[in-house]
């Protein structure tokens, strides 16, 4: 099995700014208001990954994870800034303190001991997509085919690991640092299939009118979470866990997910995930 890496680095080291510093107002003795100090800011390391994190038409960062993070951290007394990072360097960045956490549809499966996790807060299916007219119907049909994935993702780990008996021998496995490359390669017929989070593929199909078909059998059904460094002792993970519980209870999670995905309840059924 051959792996080829396409070094299409995202040159746009765009810094996504969310939630400018907020000011609280308090009444003075004279009945006038007085602005309080700006909220402390947390930096979230992320990938450009619609519908979880992306730029809207007016260049405002938006998406499921942006909205959840903004609301959750505001309840905790923080502002938040999303920074697009080199995804392959995410662990080094969070451990060094360059970012406060990793938050971008980040699968927890197999990484449980690598970080301080908050979650899972959503369920995600890792799936394989092909062109609609492809003869590939099952995972077994991928034998001898050319597959493309984003580097350092769960699909790449699954395919390179060789431990899933459902996965046949590919003709070639390609990895790209920029996830958008795999969509273009499939659209043009340069690869036979791609693998990624189902919600991300569906969003691309909607936005770009792509005629893809998702195989019925998923590669993996997993929980996604927020990752803090193991050496982070500030207690942010514990406070965020409590805040998530409150947001689930008051319906905020469902409301946010429903803005971007149909049938939001199925994405929030984290209790049904296998331990």
Task: Give residue ranges: language-model regions.
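Extended ligand-binding regions for polar small-molecule ligands
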Residues: 66-75, 136, 140-146, 151-154, ...
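Short helix-initiation/N-cap motifs at beta->coil->alpha
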Residues: 66, 82-92, 173-184, 188, ...
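Periplasmic-binding protein-like
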Residues: 47, 123-130, 206-244, 263-275
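Acidic, polar ligand-binding/catalytic clefts
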Residues: 70, 79-141, 218
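Ligand-binding cleft/hinge of the Venus flytrap
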Residues: 55, 69-78, 155-176, 205-209
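A ligand-binding cleft/hinge motif common to bilobed small-molecule-binding domains
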Residues: 89-92, 105-114, 158-161, 185-221
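N-terminal secretory signal peptides
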Residues: 1-10, 18-28
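Extracytoplasmic small-molecule ligand-binding "clamshell" domains
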Residues: 38-105, 250
């Amino acid at each position: 099995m051959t792996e080829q890496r396409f070094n299409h680095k995202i040159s746009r080291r765009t810094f996504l700014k969310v939630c400018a510093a907020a000011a609280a107002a308090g009444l003075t003795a004279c009945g006038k208001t007085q602005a309080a100090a700006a909220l402390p800011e947390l930096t979230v390391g992320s990938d450009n990954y619609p519908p979880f994190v992306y730029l809207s038409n007016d260049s405002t960062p938006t998406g499921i994870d942006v909205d959840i993070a903004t609301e959750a951290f505001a309840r905790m007394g923080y502002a938040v800034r999303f920074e697009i990072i080199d995804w392959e360097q995410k662990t080094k960045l969070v451990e060094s303190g360059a970012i406060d956490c990793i938050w971008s549809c980040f699968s927890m499966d197999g990484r449980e001991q690598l970080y301080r996790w908050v979650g899972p807060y959503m369920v995600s299916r890792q799936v394989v997509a092909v062109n609609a007219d492809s003869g590939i119907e099952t995972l077994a049909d991928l034998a001898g085919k050319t597959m493309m994935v984003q580097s350092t993702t769960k699909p790449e780990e699954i395919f390179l690991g060789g431990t899933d008996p459902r996965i046949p021998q590919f003709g070639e496995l390609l990895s790209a640092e920029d996830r958008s490359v795999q969509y273009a390669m499939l659209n043009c017929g340069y690869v036979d299939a791609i693998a990624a989070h189902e919600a991300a593929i569906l969003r691309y199909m909607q936005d770009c009118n792509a005629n893809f078909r998702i195989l019925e059998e998923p590669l993996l059904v997993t929980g996604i979470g927020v990752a803090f460094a193991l050496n982070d002792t500030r207690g942010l993970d514990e406070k965020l866990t409590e805040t998530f519980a409150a947001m689930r209870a008051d319906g905020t999670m469902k409301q946010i997910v429903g803005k971007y995905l149909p049938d939001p309840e199925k994405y929030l059924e984290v209790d049904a995930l296998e331990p």
